[in-house]
């Protein structure tokens, strides 16, 4: 389990609580468990995942306030930044767009295990999104 939670404390537009910590820990466990099957990331060391994937997913939040927007994450791969944003901001409506079928299946599994609501996963390429205009911001 991750213990260096202080890295999340230097930011003004989000806070971290025990529920978020639990979900991030579970996300990491699932990511590592499923990584070999789905080829999700080459970064697998605990502290690196939390700093380079989870914390980096929140960097633009310092410039843009997030409350309950609709957010589309195109080419989300292992769910960065979309899933991390959803964990920190559960009121957003999130659409994850991933062309790789195996990674899209991983995302479905991850969303279920993390018990995230209002998440739609589209197994599509960006060029195919014209029919999904309502998802684009």
Curated annotation (Swiss-Prot):
It is found in: Cytoplasm. GO terms for cellular component: cytosol. The keyword RNA-binding does not apply. Pfam families: GidB. S-adenosyl-L-methionine binds at residues 75, 80, 126-127. The keyword Transferase applies. It is an enzyme of class 2 (transferase). InterPro entries: rRNA_ssu_MeTfrase_G (IPR003682), SAM-dependent_MTases_sf (IPR029063). Its EC number is 2.1.1.-. Keywords: Cytoplasm, Methyltransferase, rRNA processing, S-adenosyl-L-methionine, Transferase. One of its GO terms (molecular function) is rRNA (guanine-N7-)-methyltransferase activity. PANTHER family: S-ADENOSYL-L-METHIONINE-DEPENDENT METHYLTRANSFERASES SUPERFAMILY PROTEIN. Belongs to the methyltransferase superfamily. RNA methyltransferase RsmG family. Specifically methylates the N7 position of a guanine in 16S rRNA. This is Ribosomal RNA small subunit methyltransferase G.
């Amino acid at each position: 389990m991750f213990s260096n939670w202080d890295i999340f404390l230097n930011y003004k537009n989000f806070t971290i609580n025990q529920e978020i910590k639990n979900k991030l820990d579970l996300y990491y466990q699932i990511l590592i468990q499923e990584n070999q099957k789905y080829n999700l990331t080459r970064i697998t060391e605990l502290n690196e995942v939390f700093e380079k994937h989870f914390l980096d997913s929140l960097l633009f939040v310092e410039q843009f306030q997030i409350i309950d927007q609709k957010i589309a994450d195109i080419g989300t791969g292992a769910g960065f930044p979309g899933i991390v944003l959803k964990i920190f901001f559960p009121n957003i409506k999130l659409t994850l767009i991933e062309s790789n079928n195996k990674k899209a299946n991983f995302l479905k599994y991850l969303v279920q295990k993390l018990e995230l609501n209002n998440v739609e996963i589209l197994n599509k390429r960006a060029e195919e999104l014209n029919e999904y205009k309502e998802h684009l911001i």
